[in-house]
Amino acid sequence: QLGIEKICSIEHNNAPTIWAAEGERLDEFIALYGDRYSFVEDVPSFDYVYPTEALSNLVGKKYQSKRNHISAFTRKHDWSYKCLDGSNISLIRECMEEWYADTPYCESLCKEKQGIEYILDKYDQMDIKGGCVIVGGKCVAFTFGVAINTDIFDICIEKALPDYPEAYSVI
């Protein structure tokens, strides 16, 4: 049984949504589980796939607004970036709690929060990478994800507190 299936079986047997790119891993997944899942091409989401170098360097007109947000954030705040590790899980958890407390309730966000809590609880058993933005000792944004293969990294979650909207571009 896949890990995602174990998690979803706890949630009233809901079927998971799995985002996948083309390639070897998707072909492998279809070969193993294709009869149990539907596969849908989600064209509106295609613009959320970025080359690593593009996001690392933010070169060109396309990324001007991201550069502006980062500059504005840097002017307003003395901040640092910390890689996700056991020492900052509690800070990330506090940020998560504050973000969800400030967000109107809906079932999908409740499930999202449960997923984040599960991952933070099992962090040391999972191969996730991520980080957080710290301002004044407080986590104001966080992100984490997993490597799909050597060429693709999937950002699973990205949150920034409402008082720090530019932190989305920073994180």
Residue ranges and their predicted role:
Residues 121-131:
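A short helix-loop-beta-strand connector motif used in the catalytic cores of GNAT acetyltransferases and
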Residues 103-117:
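Conserved GNAT-fold acetyl-CoA-binding loop/helix
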Residues 23-31:
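Short, charged/polar "capping" segments at the starts of alpha-helices
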Residues 130-171:
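Aromatic (often tryptophan-rich) hydrophobic motifs at membrane interfaces
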Residues 13, 76-77, 126:
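Structured helix-beta-strand junction loops
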Residues 1-5:
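Ser/Thr/Asn(+Pro)-rich, low-complexity disordered segments
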Residues 11-23:
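Conserved GNAT acetyl-CoA-binding A-motif
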Residues 34-105:
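Acyltransferase donor/substrate-recognition loop-hinge adjacent to the catalytic core
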